[in-house]
Amino acid sequence: MARTAVIAGVGPGLGESIARKFVDEGCQVGLFARSERYLDELSTDLGENVLAVPTDITDPEQVDEGFEAVREAFGPVDILVNHASGGSWKGLREISPEEFEDAWRVSSFGALCCSQAAVDDMLAENGGTIIFTGATSAVRGRDGALGFSAAKFSNRGMAESMARELGPEGIHVAHVVIDGQIETPRVEQQYPDRDEETFLDPDSVADSYWHLIEQDRSSWTLELDVRPHVEEF
């Protein structure tokens, strides 16, 4: 039986690669993002086992409606990837309270809304997987990125707390630290002379996400760090 996945905050780069990987592995996938045009283009490319659901994940009502649309199309949700992130790249003296709150709402509050919407399906099925997409800033606060760093630290704490709460119920919660820059068309334009080996390949990272989903219950990963082999850490 095909598994049903929701990717919350899909976009060009890693989110798109995760969606493609899940479809290739036989999943039925709900794609959440704000851009209806982008979602329509991506879902058309990926085929009939994909549902585009334009959603603002900071709005609990929209999130609930989005999950209900996925259930009606594909059935209960087995997999959730909390992938959305946001935040202006500003430090303490530049960031406004509104910008700080927006970073938290997109990354952390949105992840809360999506996790709450998915968890009952997983509990009813005695299993499931919830993955948080993190960043270097989740373990080492970045200078000049106060809102982003705070939100990513928050998500890491959420993942650890949820793993302890839900693990005994058969739900695998994992946090992925993306320790490096992901190669995307936009990044390639910004750094045309940069060595490709210094980038993370999004398709390879997506393979690592699928590995987390396939792990046996006797050997679950809580936190996974991924980085290019030349990345200093």
Q: Where are each of the predicted segments found?
A:
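Conserved glycine-rich Rossmann-like NAD(P)H-binding loop of the short-chain dehydrogenase/reductase
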Residues: 25-41
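Active-site loop of short-chain dehydrogenase/reductase
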Residues: 3, 76-77, 122-135, 168-172
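C-terminal helical subdomain
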Residues: 168-171, 175-177, 193-233
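Conserved glycine-rich cofactor-binding loop
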Residues: 11-13
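The beta1-alpha1 cofactor-binding region of Rossmann-like NAD(H)/NADP(H)-dependent oxidoreductases
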Residues: 37, 55-66, 97
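Catalytic loop of short-chain dehydrogenase/reductase
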Residues: 131-154, 160, 164-167
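Substrate-binding pocket helix/loop in short-chain dehydrogenase/reductase
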Residues: 91-92, 99-104
